[in-house]
Amino acid sequence: MNYSLEDLPNSGKNPRVYMDIVLNNEIIGRLQIKLFRDAFPAGVENFVQLTNGKTYRVNSNGTGKYKYNRHINRTYEGCKFHNVLHNNYIVSGDIYNSNGSSAGTVYCDEPIPPVFGDYFYPHESKGLLSLVPYTDESGNRYYDSTFMITLDDIRPSNVLDELDRDQVVIGQVYGGLDVLDKINSMIKPYAGRKYPTFSIGKCGAYLDSSQAQRKRPVNVNGTKRFLNKPTRVN
């Protein structure tokens, strides 16, 4: 399943997602994030769908009698935070190699152009989620699955004010700020210290009441009915 940049899915104006943060195979906490669709619609939808993890990339064509295709699941689950900076930010989102070398999108891995919404949010506080851009060979700027989360409020001693030049804030952590504090304390630089490797565990989107409502099955003709009709128990 893939999406098109011309026909965006709609997860609502301010969808909410969660991410469990893992260290040494143990969950150290959960981040709850509210997203701002009006800041960057295509970027927000890409982020939401990657937390849901229900899109796939065909890795190779199958062989043999049944010719099964091999698929790679596009998801943030399992992604490492491959770039960290104390009192500044943590970076993740490489859904293929988990080292910052191969990000992607749910739009058939097509890059997302910088078509922003009507609102702009500066990098001024802790817990802001923003998308990290890259520049192609022609000098054009695009976005993909790479994101960062700020670890502190803006200060003269950090570089958050520089992020507004090309990164775009698409959300904010509203639950789990203590988890960010814990991460920040563990990446404080000391001589010869090796930073721990954090990764994303289980993640997903919170459904609103309309999305969470159970719907009746639909048959091939489009009529709503139960496909397996229950039988009476005597």
Swiss-Prot record:
GO terms for cellular component: host cell cytoplasm; virion component. It is found in: Virion; Host cytoplasm. Transmembrane segments: none annotated. GO terms for molecular function: cyclosporin A binding; peptidyl-prolyl cis-trans isomerase activity. GO terms for biological process: protein folding. Its main location: virion. Keywords: Host cytoplasm, Virion. Residues 18-205 form the PPIase cyclophilin-type domain. Pfam families: Pro_isomerase. InterPro entries: Cyclophilin-like_dom_sf, Cyclophilin-type_PPIase, Cyclophilin-type_PPIase_dom. It comes from the Viruses. The keyword Transferase does not apply. Signal peptide: none annotated. PANTHER family: PEPTIDYL-PROLYL CIS-TRANS ISOMERASE, PEPTIDYL-PROLYL CIS-TRANS ISOMERASE D-RELATED. Belongs to the cyclophilin-type PPIase family. Homotrimer. This is Structural PPIase-like protein L605. It comes from Acanthamoeba polyphaga mimivirus.
